[in-house]
Amino acid sequence: INPEDPSSGLLPNVSGMEAGAYGSADKRIQAYCFRMCLSNHPENKVPFTKPENYDAYQYELLGRVFESGWRELFHKFDHIPNRKTDTNNHGPFSTDFIGGNYEYPEASYQKRAEIIQNHKDYQQGLLYFIATDPRVPIDLQTKFNEWGLAADEFTDNGNWPHQLYIREARRMIGEYVMTEKDVLTERQVPESVGMGSYTMDSHNAQRYVKPGGFVQNEGDIGVKIPVPYQISYRSLIPKAEECTNLLVPVCVSSSHIAFGSIRMEPVFMILGQSAATAAVLAMEQDVDIQQLAYHELQERLDADQQVLIYEKKESGY
């Protein structure tokens, strides 16, 4: 709380736990946020208003981040047509509500609704803090107030996105677990049903205090991959002794690191197509999905022009 006295307590949303040991497991998952559609058109923007339970102290750490000289506030205002943005998290203190989602994967629908509301309160409070608090540098604040929620988007929900960005939650432990070695093509993936190509990208999972008294974000990863990689059919199906006739194209059998790349929407569409094809073949043959012959699935996917293997071309890929 007092930057001159490490024993004075912790600021809001700073964990009192230590960083995890290498190789150890825990319940922490990468942070969630709402991806917002903003506009700087004077006739199509809604100013950022004060949330009902707003508490400026929740953003004390951000005030200190600004005081340190940080200025990357607009780095994820990705522009889309009609003077709008797809605005996402960026930087040490941003729209990601770090630590606010640990209970989400196994929570009831009622508890999940509470967690989603907490994220909304946090993020709307953040916007109001940046727009109004005197600790925000005036040049950044002036530029920030050129923006607002797009008035013609999400008109039935106060111009706020309906869906929280659930980057990761539960993951299955199936017949094959995709890992970093697979994504980096360091081992042969069996029975490919599609490919991924995005960076191994995961957001922070916690914010804690280092021994010297400084706050540290932990969990952010951004590792490029050399070439597109294969995704195994066996990572879409559970172990036969645990469950049959279930295909899982989203919460796939994967390590956290590998899922950082697999979790992209185009990959989900690719795996969804392959899972649907496997389901049809299993029904036609009256067999469990674990009993489906891969060569038959491969033939059908090839006929449907699903890309199952990376073939390098002279002009790149």
What are these regions (language model features)?
Residues 1-317:
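Flavin (FAD/FMN)-binding glycine-rich loop and adjacent Rossmann-like elements that form
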